[in-house]
Amino acid sequence: MDFNGLSMDQAPPISAPLRFYLVAPLFGILAGFMILFSDVTMLSTRYSVDSVAIAHAITIGFLGFVMLGSLTQMLPVLAGVVIPKVDAASKVSFGLLVFGTLTMLLGLMSENMLFNTISLISLGVGFTLMIGVIVLAILKVKNFNATVKAMSTSLVFASVIVIMGLFLLFTYIVDDFAEYRYVVANVHSVWGIFGFAGILIIGVTFQVLPMFYVAPRFKQFCKKRVVWIISFGLVLWLVLNIYFDAYSYLAKIWIALFFWAFATTVWKKLDLRRRPISDVTVWYWRVSSIFLTLGSFFWVFDDYFDNQYTVLVGLFIGGGFIFAIMVGMLYKIVPFLVWFHLNAMGYMTIPTINEMINKNLAKLQFILLMFSFLGFVVTFFYPLFLEASALCFIASMMLLEYNIIAPVLLYIKIKKTKPDFDMSAFATK
């Protein structure tokens, strides 16, 4: 692994990111059961209550939690700054976000104004707290590298989509604003996918591929310009979508081209890595590159089909790209955190990162997840595959939870033993 340029001494307590990581698959399981017991006709449109609830069980409960956990871990290490009160802030934010997400799902599915109101407050405070402490840390950064710049940009988009999301939730409480729901929801989803998640993934990739896979570093043009180019495209799309909708496809093409270029670059970097050993995480990177390419261009051409295939676009980009790459990152980040923190405490005779998760179970989880994604795509045309696809998804999420709990249990077990080396002599007095 390449630790060049990292401030490992600034890493937060292991509990800060782990609490988000360990709960994420549970929301995936919940989303799977919601799909299993939903009416397939209700899932064929993005604006049905079932689709909205399931989408947010995944986007907030799984993707949001993984991204927030990663920000609390990676920002201090990459930028050399301390997130203020990170453990306390993450605990409070975590509790509010879990409670807020669950009450939102209940409120949407039961059309209960009380649950929706409670979730509006919980999610609003939870996101504001977490984003706020991260922004405070970013303001102290002196050396803005490419990854930190991408994180900062993604947080701007995150702030906007959180405000939009809270407004959209408010429209389920007060009907007077429901007429604005579809316009805001469209911007909310596009900026959430490409602006927050997409740009954050690009920034993290600049660091993760060279670090974990000993792949060639990205060129300076890519690291310095691509995030701004995509951001410009997203702002251009917003303006065109609102005022000149007939020309919004031009901005879509702009955005899709640069994400396709990113996907192609990732594929080539993986081909050129100095240790070409394939594991399930490499599979996830490659599959996500394919789904990103397909989804981006599906998104462009969906306009010519009166947006009939928007759900498929969401499956390709939200599922095949963002969801898949997050799972792949969990398989690297969780064992790394366990290994790093045990090492820092003086435990030297511990399993390596690659030994902490059962490789066969990880491969089985990958296969089940891919079957479920492909099954959901087929279900769009042939509804009889819904139940089987949902069951595959549930099983894959259960396996993912088991796989990432295994290193954590190992951490707890080893911590109860005596360290191989006494690190107290190096502690700051």
Provide a role label for each language-model segment.
Residues 1-429:
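Hydrophobic alpha-helical transmembrane segments of multi-pass integral membrane proteins
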